[in-house]
Amino acid sequence: MSSAIASRRYALALLEVAIEANFLDTVTEDLLKIQEVLSGSRELLLALRSPLINVDLKSRILEEIFGKEVGEKTMIFIKLLAHKKRANLLPTVITEFSSLLDERNGVINADVKSAVKLSDEQAKELVNGLSIRTGKKIRAKMSLDEKLIGGVTVKIGDTILDGSIQHQLQLLKSSLIAEPA
């Protein structure tokens, strides 16, 4: 089984148990803490991926680092991953868990690029419009891209909405080139 499929299955199992046993908020907070530590520790990631470190040692490492930081149920889960020789999947399980939780809550991510910084009001209007258009809650990541000249581009999943001046100029250029003289 591929690691992506396994990660999704573990994440789904954790999500279902957390919902059923009513500790979803705790697990979500715990996984954010774990993700923060993992993203800041290359050595820990290497240890989790290393075939030279045995299951018991990986479990002890995880217990030592996270034992006092996360809840008992979350600790049981990450030790289970270690004992199943899947500790290397922990970062992707956390990512999949977040994606599944977003799906459940009707949240989608949008990458918004603009030529100039949007005011709070403009950003709020844009997010509300996207929310109405998609029927979902929008988590927008705003960034600047001066190449756009003006306007905005929005990427949601595989869909790109391009309202930039750069794009309009490209369309105009294409239509002028395509017209016979």
From Swiss-Prot:
Pfam families: OSCP. Transmembrane segments: none annotated. Belongs to the ATPase delta chain family. This is ATP synthase subunit delta. Keywords: ATP synthesis, Cell inner membrane, Cell membrane, CF(1), Hydrogen ion transport, Ion transport, Membrane, Transport. F-type ATPases have 2 components, F(1) - the catalytic core - and F(0) - the membrane proton channel. F(1) has five subunits: alpha(3), beta(3), gamma(1), delta(1), epsilon(1). F(0) has three main subunits: a(1), b(2) and c(10-14). The alpha and beta chains form an alternating ring which encloses part of the gamma chain. F(1) is attached to F(0) by a central stalk formed by the gamma and epsilon chains, while a peripheral stalk is formed by the delta and b chains. The keyword Thylakoid does not apply. It is a peripheral membrane protein. F(1)F(0) ATP synthase produces ATP from ADP in the presence of a proton or sodium gradient. F-type ATPases consist of two structural domains, F(1) containing the extramembraneous catalytic core and F(0) containing the membrane proton channel, linked together by a central stalk and a peripheral stalk. During catalysis, ATP synthesis in the catalytic domain of F(1) is coupled via a rotary mechanism of the central stalk subunits to proton translocation. This protein is part of the stalk that links CF(0) to CF(1). It either transmits conformational changes from CF(0) to CF(1) or is implicated in proton conduction. One of its GO terms (molecular function) is proton-transporting ATP synthase activity, rotational mechanism. Signal peptide: none annotated. InterPro entries: ATP_synth_OSCP/delta_N_sf, ATPase_OSCP/dsu. GO terms for cellular component: plasma membrane; proton-transporting ATP synthase complex. Its main location: membrane. The keyword Transferase does not apply. It is found in: Cell inner membrane.
